[in-house]
Swiss-Prot record:
Tissue specificity of this protein: Widely expressed.
Any one GO BP annotation for this protein: actin cytoskeleton organization
Region feature (C-terminal autoinhibitory region): 387-395
The UniProt record lists the keyword Acyltransferase: no
Protein name in the entry: Cytohesin-2
Gene designation per UniProt: CYTH2
A GO CC annotation given for this chain: plasma membrane
Residue ranges the record marks as coiled coil: 10-63
Localization per Swiss-Prot or TrEMBL: Cell membrane; Cytoplasm; Cell projection; Cell projection, Growth cone
Positions of the PH domain: 259-376
Binding partners and assembly: Heteromer. Composed of TAMALIN, CYTH2 and at least one GRM1. Interacts with ARRB1. Interacts with ARL4D; the interaction is direct. Directly interacts with CCDC120 through the coiled coil domain; this interaction stabilizes CCDC120, possibly by preventing its ubiquitination, and is required for neurite growth in neuroblastoma cells. Interacts with ARF1. Interacts with FRMD4A. Interacts (via N-terminal domain) with INAVA (via N-terminal domain).
CDD domains in the record: PH_GRP1-like, Sec7
Function noted in UniProt: Acts as a guanine-nucleotide exchange factor (GEF). Promotes guanine-nucleotide exchange on ARF1, ARF3 and ARF6. Activates ARF factors through replacement of GDP with GTP. The cell membrane form, in association with ARL4 proteins, recruits ARF6 to the plasma membrane. Involved in neurite growth.
């Protein structure tokens, strides 16, 4: 026995030599195993370092992506620019459109604003965005539900026009033969959107029936009428289920009366049989004129939407500094407005004109200036009229 290693006494010299070789080989293997362990340990350390580095890069990328989304929600153009510059988004219409279509963490109002811009890149992104929607075998209401949920329509007429034109082109491409032209699809789309508002807005008292909806859309199919069954299906779909319009944080009505365009005391001439002047606290904001009995009231006594209204100075023998809100080319219709009765009921206003008196000439001029800046023409009606006129002209040109 050597060094505590047992060795049988009856071994031949050859067997002893072989045993020595085995022992030496064993020692070499142990050294090799130790070396491999050390190399493996070094490799694992390197891998862990690489993983930590990759994790850090991923974390950094995610942070930059979140920052880019926030920038987009505040300023869409700058947000896209930030993402492109940081190589988080390719600067192609298709990739930008896919980013907006996925919409993760994006404000849908900001998406609508970006898609509505007139710059060359934005227009290309709009068409790429619309092409991501699959409208095949969907009726018009189903397609509009999908489209209008992917962003929030902006308020500017020209932006809405471009976006709805792109929608009409895509719908007709996916469903050839349903309409004779994209103009027909465009006009009917607006008619459906307005129907949704009329049927489901609690401030609209006069709810249109199927017959009126059908009559509204006569002659829009290149001068011909659309099948009544198609219109009935669209009408029933909207009546049974309104459009779901995206609502982003911070746009709720609790902020309506903060930072108004103008506010102050004015006299308003009543619309009843006995015309009396009543002092009211007026607030001008969001293209609406609200009036209250007291400045501390939380709910207005009346609301006058300024859509499609005009304003003019008038002389009144009873009160100085007067002006009127009126409907241009009015044919006996009442201004769309509502007021709260003493018993709490909300009823439609009873005014063909609203006559108002300011305390001074200067205040009258300021109110007129502010209201003129706020008065807006409803873009739906404006664009619808223009497109219907185009269909009518086209029909006349085709007649022998």
């Amino acid at each position: 026995m050597e060094d505590g290693v047992y060795e049988p006494p009856d071994l031949t010299p050859e067997e002893r030599m072989e045993l020595e070789n085995i022992r030496r080989r064993k020692q070499e293997l142990l050294v090799e195993i130790q070396r491999l362990r050390e190399e493996l340990s070094e490799a694992m350390s390197e891998v862990e370092g690489l993983e930590a580095n990759e994790g850090s890069k991923t974390l950094q990328r995610n942070r930059k992506m979140a920052m880019g989304r926030k920038k987009f929600n505040m300023d869409p153009k700058k947000g896209i620019q930030f993402l492109v510059e940081n190589e988080l988004l390719q600067n192609t219409p298709e990739e930008i459109a896919r980013f907006l279509y996925k919409g993760e963490g994006l404000n849908k109002t900001a998406i609508g604003d970006y898609l509505g811009e007139r710059e060359e890149l934005n227009l290309a992104v709009l068409h790429a965005f619309v092409d991501l929607h699959e409208f095949t075998d969907l009726n018009l209401v189903q397609a509009l539900r999908q489209f209008l949920w992917s962003f929030r329509l902006p308020g500017e007429a020209q932006k809405i026009d471009r976006m709805m034109e792109a929608f009409a082109q895509r719908y007709c491409l996916c469903n050839p033969g349903v309409f004779q032209s994209t103009d027909t699809c465009y006009v009917l789309s607006f008619a459906v959107i307005m129907l949704n508002t009329s049927l489901h807005n609690p401030n609209v008292r006069d709810k249109p029936g199927l017959e009126r909806f059908v009559a509204m859309n006569r002659g829009i199919n290149e001068g011909g009428d659309l099948p009544e069954e198609l219109l009935r299906n669209l009408y029933d779909s909207i009546r049974n289920e309104p459009f779901k319009i995206p609502e982003d944080d911070g746009n709720d009505l609790t902020h309506t009366f903060f930072n108004p365009d103008r506010e102050g005391w004015l006299l308003k001439l009543g619309g009843g049989r006995v015309k009396t002047w009543k002092r009211r606290w007026f607030i001008l904001t969001d293209n609406c004129l609200y009036y209250f009995e007291y400045t501390t009231d939380k709910e207005p006594r009346g609301i006058i939407p300024l859509e499609n209204l005009s304003i003019r100075e008038v002389d009144d023998p009873r009160k100085p500094n007067c002006f009127e809100l009126y409907i241009p080319n009015n044919k006996g219709q009442l201004i769309k407005a509502c007021k709260t009765e003493a018993d709490g009921r909300v009823v439609e206003g009873n005014h063909m004109v609203y006559r108002i008196s300011a305390p001074t000439q200067e205040e009258k001029d300021e109110w007129i200036k502010s209201i003129q800046a706020a008065v807006s023409v409803d873009p739906f009606y404006e664009m619808l009229a223009a497109r219907k006129k185009r269909i009518s002209v086209k029909k006349k040109q085709e007649q022998p």
